[in-house]
Amino acid sequence: IIYEPETRTNTIVIEVHGLCGSFYENRFIDILAKTYTKKGISLLTFNNRGTNFVAELLQGNEFKVIGGCHERFKDCLLDIEGAINFVKEKNYDEIILQGHSYGCNKVIYYYNNKKDEFIKKLVLLGPCDIQEECKKYLSEEEYDNLKTESAKLVKEGKPRQMLNFSLNGNGKISAGTYYYDFLPNTETDFIRYREGVNSKSKELNNIKVPVLVVFGDMDECVLTQDIEIVKEYLKNNIKECNIQIIKGADHSFTDKYEELGEVINNNI
């Protein structure tokens, strides 16, 4: 969906949803659409290949099974590039990439890999240390089993075989997705709150545009470490970093949508 103001400008926000999400799932989208369009900024929200737990994609005359349980993180380059090409065709030349949760990792990864001069700003809603999140919220038995079984199945040529993964709403994830993207030192592992405030992230250090970071003080996914550690880590790694905390907000900004809209309105 593309939301446009009555008087259109050349600026658009591209929203990238999180793990197993969708373009319409987050209830804050309607509020942000109103907030952005009142400022003369358009908003595009779209499904990427990590949408829902399992989904179907029509390629030619054949259906391919995709979804968050099967996606490879690196393929986000194709999804975001498609969205950017779409808005460029509509003559937008100032792009704000906005990610929520796992979408934050994707927009940072895209920015670093593509270095598109049309990208003028990043908005990160609830950026997570994915690997620490797994370690903290999975039982020790499940964590160890996922590590062992995913490696075994990938080696056997069975990356699409499902494993139990209690952090997903459907309780499943494919061996390949976990092995390639959720273990430490994989391509997603560049937000490392677990390493402390002085730890350096090349991917975050390389960002040369302003970054707005927003999360709640009740965000169970971001706050795998103390909130002050998270804030200092981000400030020490991102050159132009504006951090805004919403009191009482969880990872989905439940019942804090208006407050999120106010933060966006005051900081974009």
Residue ranges with predicted function:
Residues T7-N61:
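Short, surface-exposed "cap/lid" segments of acyl-processing enzymes
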Residues E220-E228:
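Conserved alpha/beta-hydrolase "acid-adjacent" motif
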Residues A249-E259:
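Catalytic histidine-centered segment of alpha/beta-hydrolase-like enzymes
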Residues V123-E132:
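Active-site nucleophile loop of the alpha/beta-hydrolase fold
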Residues Q59, K64-E89:
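Alpha/beta-hydrolase active-site loop
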Residues G99-G103, V107:
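Gly/Ala-rich beta-loop-alpha elbow adjacent to hydrolase catalytic centers
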Residues I207, V213-F215, D219:
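Short beta-strand/loop motif that positions the catalytic acidic residue
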Residues I1-E4:
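A short loop-to-beta-strand scaffold at the N-terminal edge of the catalytic core in hydrolase folds
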